């Protein structure tokens, strides 16, 4: 794809609004082609390395299925399956894998790791998730939003992110808003707002593209008129229990529930979540949260909202694969 060949995909602000739109158009075409049985394999003979320092269901499956659909072969390197950063430096790993593979996906820790891989690999490197950014998720989110509001351009859409915005999702949403002109509202306690420097940079770009970025602690004001309400988990199994209590106390008022959905004043408002979600007590962590903190029926989102007609989370999950396929096709085929 012209302009993308052999480029890396590390964070959204590495691209222009036009380039982002091109990727979304390609993803929509690839999705339609797959569903109609007309998909053309562009990556036959390509070999792809998938480095996972953090496990994932959606990201791994998306890359693997997308690669297979396009005729490529993959090697999965899990948390215990490589020496990256332990017995071998990131720089050396990049140079080794770059001699064997046509593209490398990295999902793990610091953004500096994926940046180093990109610097030394000599082949396209794709960010499947770092502590700072999650660009492939936002591609899927944007495609899903387009599908559910086909008559509206992004600069006429309002997206609310409720909960903990001081993470890779909050950062990548800022970048997405900067490029698309979304009306993005981060509705969260001030302690959970993203870094001020990134907010300032993205707000200036968003305004140039017809959008706006708002940070507020006021739930009612923040969600008014929203087209989409998005949230993510508050805690993870890797965090100390003391953190759980602190985070839950801080974020309880930002749970996405039927009241918050009604406060939008929009009967057509849709619910988004990057998954996995703790919406019931049917998981190990969900059960612990219910028992220890009384969070029966959901943590960051209630089961009622998650299972409602407003929930489009599984459209999002499917679109991870189509948008990731677009990234690989764009960067590996001329």
UniProtKB/Swiss-Prot annotation:
Keywords of this entry: Amino-acid biosynthesis, Arginine biosynthesis, Cytoplasm, Transferase
Top-level taxonomic group: Bacteria
Molecular function in Gene Ontology: amino acid binding; ornithine carbamoyltransferase activity
Gene3D superfamilies hit by this protein: Aspartate/ornithine carbamoyltransferase
Chain sites annotated for binding L-ornithine: 168, 232, 236-237
Residues passing through the membrane, by range: none
Catalytic activity, reaction form: carbamoyl phosphate + L-ornithine = L-citrulline + phosphate + H(+)
Cellular component terms (Gene Ontology): cytoplasm
Binding positions (carbamoyl phosphate): 56-59, 83, 107, 134-137, 274-275, 320
Main localization of the protein described in the UniProt heading: cytoplasm
Gene Ontology biological process terms from the UniProt entry: arginine biosynthetic process via ornithine; citrulline biosynthetic process; L-arginine biosynthetic process
Subcellular location: Cytoplasm
InterPro entries according to UniProt: Asp/Orn_carbamoyltranf_P-bd, Asp/Orn_carbamoylTrfase, Asp/Orn_carbamoylTrfase_sf, Asp_carbamoyltransf_Asp/Orn-bd, Orn/put_carbamltrans, OTCase_ArgI
Annotated PROSITE patterns: CARBAMOYLTRANSFERASE
Pathway where this protein functions: Amino-acid biosynthesis; L-arginine biosynthesis; L-arginine from L-ornithine and carbamoyl phosphate: step 1/3
UniProt-listed Enzyme Commission number(s): 2.1.3.3
Top EC group: transferase
Xref: NCBIfam families: orni_carb_tr, PRK04284.1, PRK12562.1
Role noted for this protein: Reversibly catalyzes the transfer of the carbamoyl group from carbamoyl phosphate (CP) to the N(epsilon) atom of ornithine (ORN) to produce L-citrulline.
Family per similarity comment: Belongs to the aspartate/ornithine carbamoyltransferase superfamily. OTCase family.
Protein's recorded name: Ornithine carbamoyltransferase
């Amino acid at each position: 794809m012209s302009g993308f060949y052999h480029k890396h995909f590390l964070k959204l602000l590495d691209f222009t609004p036009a380039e982002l739109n091109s990727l979304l158009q390609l993803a929509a075409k690839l999705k339609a082609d797959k569903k109609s049985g007309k998909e053309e394999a562009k990556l036959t003979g390509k070999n792809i390395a998938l480095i996972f320092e953090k496990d994932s269901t959606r990201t791994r499956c998306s890359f693997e299925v997308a690669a297979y659909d396009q005729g490529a072969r993959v090697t999965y390197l899990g948390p215990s399956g490589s020496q990256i950063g332990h017995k071998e430096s990131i720089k050396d790993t990049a140079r080794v894998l770059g001699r064997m593979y046509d593209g490398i996906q990295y999902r793990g820790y610091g953004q500096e790791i994926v940046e180093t891989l990109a610097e030394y690999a000599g082949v396209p490197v794709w960010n499947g998730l770092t502590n700072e950014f999650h660009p492939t998720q936002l591609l899927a989110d944007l495609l899903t939003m387009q599908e559910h509001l086909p008559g509206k351009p992004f600069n006429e859409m309002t997206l609310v992110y409720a909960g903990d915005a001081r993470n890779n999702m909050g950062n990548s949403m800022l970048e997405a808003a900067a490029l698309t002109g979304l009306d993005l509202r981060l509705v969260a306690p001030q302690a959970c707002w993203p870094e001020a420097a990134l907010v300032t940079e993205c707000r200036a770009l968003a305004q140039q593209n017809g959008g706006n970025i708002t940070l507020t602690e006021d739930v009612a004001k923040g969600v008014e008129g929203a087209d989409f309400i998005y949230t993510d988990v508050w805690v993870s199994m890797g965090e100390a229990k003391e953190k759980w209590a602190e985070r839950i106390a801080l974020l309880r008022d930002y749970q996405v529930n039927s009241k918050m959905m009604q406060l939008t004043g929009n009967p057509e408002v849709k619910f988004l979540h990057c998954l996995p979600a703790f919406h019931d007590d049917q998981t190990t962590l969900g059960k612990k949260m219910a028992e220890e903190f009384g969070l029966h029926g959901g943590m960051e989102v209630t089961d009622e909202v998650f299972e409602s007609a407003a929930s489009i989370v599984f459209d999002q999950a499917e679109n991870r694969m189509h948008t990731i396929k677009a990234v690989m096709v764009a960067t590996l085929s001329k």
